[in-house]
A protein has these predicted regions:
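Cysteine-centered catalytic environments shared across enzyme families
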Residues: 1-302
Length: 302
């Protein structure tokens, strides 16, 4: 888990807003205790708080890359599960990599495919990419909305962050709640209507949604929607497909430069995950996996 935030306003010199940007970053410190980074270019500021999982040295953020004379900057929170496939595709197109982080793969996927890169990403993520030459910001959230991304658009600019409190720290956003916010709290809370940020003016990018902010205008696009279809497979086909999809999903999420561990709840789901991961570790000679569970006094009575 990492934290990202940004502020884009061509009428503001972000180099004079460092104290405010620092406060915004501090609100996200628990999301990224290992490193923090700041990028400033005139009216654009990008913030990142990092929890290191992959490529400690070459995965630092904000991350910059150039291609054909154009510069792109990314702040990214997430995990990509088809990193290797995308990297090979990009290498075949002439893109070079200085490390093995998924951040660099996402950035260069955007450099090649622009907004259409979202269709190719398999994972959980929220990220922002600043195109210096176009003076634009691209925001994107994963297909099922695992990673959060809130934003506040105002006359002349936009702020975004992994958490609402980072937006409030900017002082541009006021902690006000209107009728809609009250409805969300008293009738739906702790759930929320998709895209609603509860506080007045704060919105959240929906799952499977991207947005481009350019020329003081935010253009949103839904790149993915879940579709329900009639189930026509036999029992045998269903079992085989479920086994394949589950195994593939678990194995793809075992990539890490840091030690992994598993929490056992005693239920069927966590047991299946550990069994599948254990088989992957055995086949790839990665040693034993670490598991944890909670024990408390008089547990056996309940």
């Amino acid at each position: 888990m990492c934290g990202i935030a940004g502020w884009f306003d061509n009428e503001i010199d972000m180099s004079k807003q460092i104290p405010v940007l620092y406060k915004m970053s501090q609100t996200l410190s628990k999301r990224g205790p290992d490193e923090n980074g700041l990028y400033i270019n005139k009216g654009c500021a990008l913030l990142h708080r990092r929890l290191i999982v992959i490529d400690k040295e070459n995965g630092k953020q904000p991350m910059a890359a150039r291609h054909r004379g154009k510069t792109y900057i990314i702040v990214y929170n997430g995990e990509l599960y088809n990193t290797d496939e995308l990297r090979e595709d990009l290498k075949a197109s002439g893109y070079h990599f200085r490390g093995h982080s998924d951040t660099e793969v996402v950035l260069k996927s955007y450099m090649k495919y622009k907004e259409k890169c979202a269709d190719m990403l398999n994972g959980i993520f929220a990220f922002a990419i600043y195109d210096v030459s176009e003076n634009s910001i691209f925001l994107c959230r994963d297909k099922i909305g695992v990673k959060p991304l809130f934003y506040y658009e105002y006359d002349g600019g936009i702020l975004f962050a992994s958490e609402i409190k980072a937006l409030l720290a900017s002082k541009i956003v006021k902690p006000q709640i209107d009728e809609t916010g009250l409805y969300e709290i008293f009738f739906l809370g702790p759930a929320r209507t998709p895209s609603c940020g509860v506080f007045k003016g704060i919105k959240e990018l929906k799952p499977g949604e991207s947005a481009l902010y350019k020329n003081q205008k935010l253009t949103k696009k839904s790149y993915f929607t879940i579709q329900a279809k009639e189930h026509t497979d036999s029992v045998e086909e269903t079992v085989e497909k479920t086994r394949f999809l589950l195994t593939d999903a678990i194995n793809r999420q075992l990539v890490s430069d840091m030690p992994l561990c598993f929490f056992l709840s005693g239920g069927l789901d966590s047991s299946i995950i550990v069994k599948t991961a254990s088989q992957y570790y055995k086949e790839n000679k990665l040693g034993k996996i670490n598991t944890y569970s909670v024990e408390y006094r008089d547990n056996e009575k309940f």
